[in-house]
A protein has these predicted regions:
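Bacterial N-terminal signal peptides
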Residues: 11-19
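Short beta-strand edge/turn micro-motifs at domain boundaries
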Residues: 149-177
Length: 207
């Protein structure tokens, strides 16, 4: 699998599972697996609506981002991604960084939803320890006549907003660790402000 495709999956699969094969594992409606399924159902409904009425894409995009905001723990993801540099930042700086990262992830997510990726998902297990959970899935990706399998793990935690995803791991590659490595390298070689500027420029990039 190409690096570009893997990067796309790391973001898009953090929020959506397209089809679930096999019998459901035991899971309560308000548990982590239940949260994933409800989110998936809502997203798929919105995508079907968008396909029927392309002219209404913008309102649907806004609803998609709202659904994602209720599923992905952006503040926790931002804190973990910035790593040891988080403590040195003021409350205002933390909020700014979290918002920039949120916008970048959401934009990438919406882009991937409109791609031609075709994949199905099987749940391998759900593990809950206190307020932490891990959902393991096997995902078969079909692209240009080829089929490849990935094992995706969703890291979730339970907070005031219920169960939310804060990291995704595929092929032993963690979204959080990947971000943290990139951000730390930029801060060490340049500065924290240089990192913010790079994020802002990325947001302005139409690609």
């Amino acid at each position: 699998m190409s690096r570009a495709l893997r990067r796309a999956l790391l973001v898009s699969l953090a929020f959506i599972v397209v089809a679930v094969a096999g019998r459901a594992r035991a899971a309560t409606a308000d548990g982590p697996l239940g949260k994933v399924r409800r989110t998936n159902d809502r997203i798929m409904g919105l995508l079907r609506k968008q396909a029927r009425s392309p002219a209404g894409a913008k309102p649907i995009d806004r609803e998609l981002t709202r659904v994602v905001a209720q599923f992905l723990d952006f503040p926790e993801l931002a804190r973990l991604a910035l790593g040891r540099h988080w403590e040195a930042r003021s409350a205002t700086e933390r909020q700014e960084f979290s918002e920039l990262l949120r916008q970048l992830i959401e934009r990438s997510y919406l882009k991937q939803l409109r791609s031609n990726l075709n994949y199905t998902v099987r749940y391998l297990g759900e593990k809950i320890v206190g307020d932490q959970a891990e959902i393991s899935t096997s995902i078969e990706v079909k692209r240009k006549g080829r089929s490849e399998a990935l094992v995706i793990q969703y890291k979730m935690r339970r907070g005031t907003g219920g169960w939310m995803v804060y990291d995704v791991i595929t092929d032993d590659v963690s979204v959080v660790r990947n971000y943290r490595s990139q951000f730390n390298r930029i801060i060490q070689r340049q500065s924290y402000n240089a990192l913010l500027e790079k994020l802002r420029r990325k947001l302005k990039d139409p690609a």
